[in-house]
Design a protein with these regions (language model features):
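Non-catalytic interaction-recognition regions
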Residues: 1-99, 110, 114-595
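Short, charged, solvent-exposed linker or helix-capping segments at domain edges/interfaces
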Residues: 100-105
């Protein structure tokens, strides 16, 4: 039997619809959906097929729904089909169809839910890409978790996924990092210069003052002694030291960022250097490609309304015809002095991803970059002749609270809560799951107290507890005097007829929606759907557990009922497998027991 009963039923609904209305076009049929009903009293699934087809067929949707229900009611997986509302058809699965999915889950194991909707399409998911000028903070954390979970759910749905980090190792912020690291070096060798004096003496100002650069200064001191300073331990000419200081600072910052990502459970496959792209001539090549397409011209943009962008100037610039691809205004690529804009560098980077074979590009950005979306989509459309879509997932700000009050400061970073602070406080699993309990474009509060609470209000505890309970039942069965079989292969052959309680069937209904959930989350680029699903699944299992405490006939292990015990163990094992599969997508550990 197929893993995805919703896909099976959609195929049958479409078959019936085509038999009734052979004139329907593929585009019209593509709009047919089979979805879970909101109220189980109305059945297990509902389809909009009659409402989709009624208008082009010139029929009444309610009458068409009645005809479809009559055709579908005889299907072997269905116990019934009824028209509903203005033209929906509610479908009720047979108990045999529900029970038949338990062996499917047990035989598939954690691969249950693996799909083919991605069809091997090559997707590049770029996320985090934090400037290597300091430790990762809470905002980077959300983007890292969202991007990583998105990549995982898309891979499970059948896409070929590459995960990537763009290292912004060129430009003004890296220059400022070099100067800030040099100040920490001067401190390490005993220079009397103060922060205020150094700030006034540098071209960038002292922009990064957190303690995290102290180890960089110490490393420079150990490597070079006082050779990078003046004889009186003052600021030497940058030609003497700047490149060496910047390179060591960048290397140490990227090492720390990689360590933070590893602690968070994020391991990206590709790290692309902005500076390497610039040095390879990629920007010139990308601009030349646009020029060959007739999309470059010299001109002066109208003064912008409101806040003036960094790349606007009242002089001729090299401009990209972004308005031809849906943007509000044309965009500068080169300034009047001949230097490239940051947009030009980003064009080169995305052109490189296209050249490496990406068929879909997904960038996960902070919401503060929302104004950049239209220009990047425009230029990717231009570069790829519309073949490669660029999708942007925006992550809103995260507020950390404790005791109802905001937590703002990190001693080490100076001005923000670092990822390391958060991981030390509540652990990786709580961080990852909590970050996915809101849609990425919604602001969220991360409550430190709730993240460690052993209550239903803490979603990671609630879901891990359900898995731990499943595992405890299976261990108890293994260690019982009767030593019931708990291997998936054996349980897949169990007689499941004893599973007839409404709560047992409700749990099965939740389990069988997992393949559809994976497909939907991947196509919508919404990994938070997995977290919501797991929370609801855990709730169904906990309800069954609690019901068994009050009704002895629903207890999982009953020495006098071997057949019933095997059936319930099969259900418990299937539940554990689906929870484990979902937690893998989220990058969260499935707990064997709660401590």
């Amino acid at each position: 039997m197929s893993q995805n009963l919703f896909a099976v039923m959609r195929d049958h609904v479409v078959e019936a619809l085509r038999a009734l209305l052979p004139q329907l076009t593929p585009e019209q049929v593509a709009r047919v959906e089979v979805t879970p009903t909101r109220d189980p009293a109305h059945g297990d699934m509902a389809t909009n097929a009659a409402m989709v087809a009624a208008k082009p067929a010139g029929q009444n949707p309610r009458s068409l729904a009645q005809s479809l229900a009559e055709r579908r009611g005889a299907h072997p997986l269905l116990a019934g089909a009824e028209p509903a509302g203005p033209g929906f058809v509610n479908l009720r699965l047979s108990t045999a169809a529900l029970l038949g999915q338990i062996p499917v889950i047990l035989r598939a194991g954690e691969a249950y839910g693996d799909g083919s909707v991605g069809a091997g399409v090559r997707v590049n998911v770029e996320y985090v890409s934090a400037n290597p000028t300091g430790p990762m903070h809470i905002g980077h954390c959300r983007g890292a978790v969202v991007g990583d979970a998105l990549a995982r759910v898309m891979a499970k749905a059948g896409f070929t996924v590459t995960t990537e980090y763009y290292v912004n190792d060129a430009g003004g912020q890296v220059q400022a990092l070099g100067w800030a690291a040099y100040w920490r070096y001067l401190q390490a060798i005993g220079s009397p210069i103060t922060a205020e004096e150094f700030d006034a003496a540098t071209p960038t100002g002292l922009q990064y003052r957190g303690d995290y650069l102290i180890p960089v200064g110490q490393a420079l001191s150990e490597q070079f002694g006082a050779a990078l300073a003046t004889p009186d331990l003052g600021v030497a000419e940058p030609d003497l030291w700047f490149d060496r200081v910047r390179e060591l600072a960048l290397s140490m910052m990227m090492t720390e960022i990689r360590e933070d990502l590893a602690l968070l459970g994020v391991r990206q496959e590709v790290f692309s250097s902005e500076r390497a792209l610039l040095e390879s001539g990629a920007v010139d090549r990308a601009i030349a490609t646009l020029d060959e397409k007739g999309l470059i011209y010299e001109g002066v943009l109208e003064p912008p309304k409101g806040k003036t962008p960094e790349d606007w100037e009242p002089r001729p610039q090299t401009l990209f015809r972004a308005t031809e691809f849906g943007d509000d205004v044309d965009r500068p690529l080169r300034k009047s002095d001949g230097s490239n804009t940051y947009f030009a560098n980003d064009i080169a980077y995305h052109a490189d991803k296209i050249a490496r074979g990406a068929e879909v590009m997904i960038d996960v950005w902070g919401a503060d970059h929302g104004g950049y979306v239209s220009r990047m989509k425009a230029v990717v459309k231009a570069l790829s002749d519309g073949r490669v879509p660029l999708e942007i997932v925006l992550c809103q700000i995260v507020h950390v609270i404790r005791g109802g009050q905001p937590v703002r400061m990190s001693k080490r970073a100076g001005t923000f809560v670092t990822l390391r602070d958060l991981l030390d406080e509540v652990g990786r699993d709580a961080v990852r799951f909590t970050m996915l309990m809101r849609k990425s474009d919604a602001q969220m509060e991360f409550d430190l107290d709730q993240a460690v609470a052993q209550t239903r209000e803490n979603p990671v505890f609630y879901v891990q507890y359900a898995h731990a309970r499943c595992r405890s039942v299976l261990r108890a069965a293994r260690d019982s005097p009767g030593a019931a079989a708990i291997e998936a292969t054996a349980l897949a052959e169990a007689d499941l007829s004893a599973l007839d309680d409404p709560q047992e069937l409700a749990l099965i209904r939740r389990l069988i929606s997992w393949p559809r959930l994976v497909e939907g989350a991947a196509l919508a680029r919404e990994p938070h759907r997995v977290a919501f699903f797991l929370y609801d699944l855990a709730g169904e299992f906990h309800m069954l557990w609690n019901k068994g405490r009050d009704d002895s006939t629903l207890r999982f292990l009953q020495a006098e009922d071997v057949v019933g015990t095997s059936a319930r163990l099969a259900l418990v094992a299937a539940t554990a497998m689906v929870i484990r599969s979902g937690l893998f997508v989220l990058g969260v550990t499935p707990a064997e027991e709660m401590r």
